[in-house]
Design a protein with these regions (language model features):
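Long amphipathic all-alpha helical oligomerization modules
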Residues: 193-226
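Alpha-helical bundle segments that constitute or directly flank the non-heme di-iron/ferroxidase center
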Residues: 37-42, 57-86, 155-165, 237
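N-terminal regions that are enriched for targeting/export leaders
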Residues: 19-24, 28-35
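Short alpha-helical hairpin
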Residues: 12-16, 33-57, 76, 204-213
């Protein structure tokens, strides 16, 4: 994988931590973070992520990840569109339209260049089966989008965005020079970039605004949804590491 110019790496370091909450009390996002943080920390110990950070991940494993993540993101965008169609609030619809554009930009900026460089073809993508655990994750989010209120749906999908920002940020801090010299450093650059962290912050703020004063029972349910998705994310890392030997 090609190494980007030095200024790209420095830019990613400057944006590190910008996705973090400002510590204001009483926000749903504070509670979500407390609920899922230990699961995200477990993710950082997954072999796939550790080997990507230190540069020892086998290329065929990264190739398989790129295919599965591409298939996942296509379904993720479809789920966002379902939420948009079900929402009656213009502000929420605008936010979702912006989020869809940002996710599509992630595909263009991160996925397509990597897949072209890896020689991944459309035929290869079409012939690849999604692992069962990843299918379960997609169906879980899709069910929430179809059946539950917008806040529950957005909370579920937020985990993926926030987890990537959190994991990339903390692993850059932990691995430092190893990531800088890793053939996979572009992945960490992408998910610590200003564009990505700004998009993630907007999502956190939207969830907080929708959860202005939920009762305790609903907050607990939202936390349960969020941490369930965090668990599915960890299953995802296991699936992409073991799925293509």
């Amino acid at each position: 994988m090609a190494i980007r110019a030095e200024d790209m790496w420095q830019s990613s370091l400057k944006s590190r931590g910008d996705f973090q909450r400002d510590g204001a009390a009483g926000r749903l996002s504070d509670r979500l973070l407390m609920t899922a943080e230990s699961v995200w920390q477990e993710a950082m110990e997954k072999q796939f992520l550790r080997e990507m950070a230190d540069g020892t991940l086998r290329p065929e494993r990264f190739r398989y990840y790129m295919i599965i993540d591409d298939l996942y993101l296509i379904e993720y965008i479809k789920t966002l569109r379902i939420i948009e169609e079900r929402s009656a609030e213009p502000e929420i619809r605008r936010f979702l339209q912006d989020t869809i554009k940002a996710t599509e930009e992630e595909l263009r900026r991160v996925h397509i260049p990597n897949m072209v460089q890896l020689g991944i073809t459309e035929k290869e993508i079409a012939e690849t089966s999604v692992p069962e655990k990843v299918k379960d994750y997609i169906l879980y989010m899709r069910g929430l989008a179809l059946e539950r209120p917008v806040l529950e749906s957005l909370t579920a999908l937020l985990d993926c965005s926030w987890a990537y920002a959190y994991i990339a940020d903390h692993m850059v801090g932990r691995y430092g020079e190893k990531i800088r010299n890793s053939p996979y450093r572009d992945w960490f650059t992408a998910y610590t970039s200003r564009e990505y962290t700004d998009s993630n912050r907007a999502w956190i703020d939207m969830v907080d605004s929708l959860a202005d004063s939920p009762d305790e029972e609903r907050q607990e349910e939202l936390c349960r949804i969020f941490v369930t998705c965090a668990g599915y994310e960890n299953d995802f890392w296991d699936a992409v590491y073991c799925g293509e030997e």
